[in-house]
Every structure is written in structure tokens, then in C-alpha cells.
Design a protein with these regions (language model features):
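Long, low-complexity or tandemly repetitive, helically biased scaffold regions used
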Residues: 2-127
Length: 127
């Protein structure tokens, strides 16, 4: 897999987060749909981690380890956010859409940083 394809997976995850943030902001409501969207984003990040792991196995000199660790960190934070807005909790407690949008903004910044880390990896001897 090329570096461009790897970055495309990260970009897709970033776009998914952006869509969740826009949905919450526009509705001014956190829904179970948002929970499902975050689960999809988590799955995308899991795919990204798998691709990075495969390439890491091939070349220890590619500089992928930091990207892998950061991908795992972002995935865990998104999983935690999805757990925070789980459907059973949404029925029992009001969750502030503003707070969720702020949390999603933080994760979007983390995705931008991940993209920067992915820029620094080398695959196949090319940057």
C-alpha cells in the first residue's frame, strides 16, 4: 500500500469526524446515529492501524511506530467518546451538544496531527 493510500484512510476518518460534528451542531442534539458514526470512525482507524502494522512488519526503518501509537491513541479517545454517548446513556442523561462538538474538534486536531505524522513516514525508500 502506498503512502498516499494510507493518508487517504486517515483523511476518510477525519471526514467522518467532521460529519459527526456538523450533524451534532446542526441538530443541536446528540443522537444514537452519532454513536454509530463514531463506531464507524473507530473501525476506519482500526483499519489504518492494521495497514501501518503491516508496513511496519516489512520495514522497521519506515518511521511508522509513532504513527501507529498515535493512531491507537486517537482510536481509544474516539471509542471513549462513543461510549460516553452510548444509546442507553442518551435515554437517561442530557448530553450537551456543545460539549460533544468541542470534544470532536479536539479529535479533529488530533487527526490533523496524525496526518502530519503520516507525512513523515517512508515507504519503499521514498518519502
Amino acid at each position: 500500500m502506498t503512502k498516499t493510500q494510507i493518508k487517504a484512510i486517515a483523511l476518510n476518518a477525519s471526514r467522518q469526524l467532521n460529519a459527526v460534528a456538523k450533524d451534532v451542531y446542526n441538530r443541536d442534539l446528540v443522537t444514537t446515529i452519532n454513536h454509530d458514526q463514531l463506531k464507524e470512525t473507530s473501525a476506519t482507524l482500526n483499519d489504518l492501524y492494521g495497514v501501518l502494522d503491516t508496513n511496519y512488519q516489512r520495514s522497521m526503518k519506515a518511521g511508522i511506530d509513532e504513527s501507529m501509537e498515535y493512531t491507537e491513541l486517537v482510536k481509544k479517545r474516539i471509542d471513549a467518546l462513543a461510549e460516553y454517548i452510548r444509546p442507553t446513556r442518551l435515554k437517561a442523561v442530557h448530553i450537551s451538544p456543545k460539549q460533544i462538538v468541542q470534544m470532536l474538534d479536539t479529535e479533529q486536531q488530533a487527526m490533523h496531527h496524525l496526518s502530519t505524522l503520516l507525512d513523515d513516514i517512508t515507504l519503499g525508500g521514498k518519502a
